[in-house]
Amino acid sequence: MADKNFQMSTGVAAVVQKVVEACQDESKRLDLIEVAKNYPPNQLRNMQRTFQAITGTFLDAFLKKHLSKDFETLVLMLYKPRAQLLCELIRGATKGAGTDEKCLVDVLLTIEAHEVREIRQLYYQLYNDSLGDVVRKDCGNKYMWAKLVNAVATGDRIPRETHELEEDLVLVRKAIETKGVKKDEVSTWIRIFATYTRADFRQLHRMYAVKYNGESLRAGVEDEFQGLDEYAFKLAHDFLYDPCCAAAFSMNVAFAGSGNDSDRLNRITAMHFRECKGCKYYYKKVYGQAFDERCTTELKGVYGEAIKLLWEPVTVPLLSMEDCQGGEHRPMTLEL
């Protein structure tokens, strides 16, 4: 039946065989990571269909049978279509009695504008529910991180005119200079982080540094918030400026404390290892330690090797803010 209903190339069949062997032989576990890293998502989906046709088993079920713990969770995430993964993470964070605030922050504050629109549609198709309504109901509107997440989940990013940037420059300065957390100032940050395009935010960043003797917007965020609020607003800032910055920041937070946060390590890695090519560069530049060294210290066995392998070892950042591909600004890594 499989031969009749599924035409498969020798290449895809070979990948399926590689996945099977990697699951069954512990010494070949990292082959699962190599496949996820080297094959684009559309080819991975084709491989999964071929896997089921050959073995008669869903890939997820096969992986769960042979893998365990953090490595299993990571691999399962890597082999899911991105939009499906994001929806499942959000669903898992909001269902049940409690809310996984950290997961909602990590997911909703580090996806691009076009993805937010796509996720809204897919979420409704999968769960017959509105993403915005679910997030709003689960997070409430009491905490500042929740207000920010709600704004991102329901808003749209709109290009600004020069005069609008100049007006916001004044409001941002006022927010930074205001002692204590005030409603109007928080609203300014939320509006900017939830509705600015990346190009406009980078321009605002440059304008602020020029006008205020090299001061950084991020420093203002650091002084403004605490706890999860601080993490959320820093993450939103970094992602809007450059996804590589956000990935490095979040991974460093996951490493901090008495034990590392493997849930966050898995989320951020699975979501961003493909496009954030400058993460390791930025990590070393900001945190003073090579990313691979930190992984070796904090993580054990094949799981640690997998995390290191997925993030590419880039030593030189992309150089130009004006360097574009297909009309989209390419992520870059600069000093904040």
Regions picked out by a protein language model, each given a short descriptive name:
Residues 1-336:
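Structural signature for extended repeat/solenoid scaffolds and their inter-repeat hinge/linker regions
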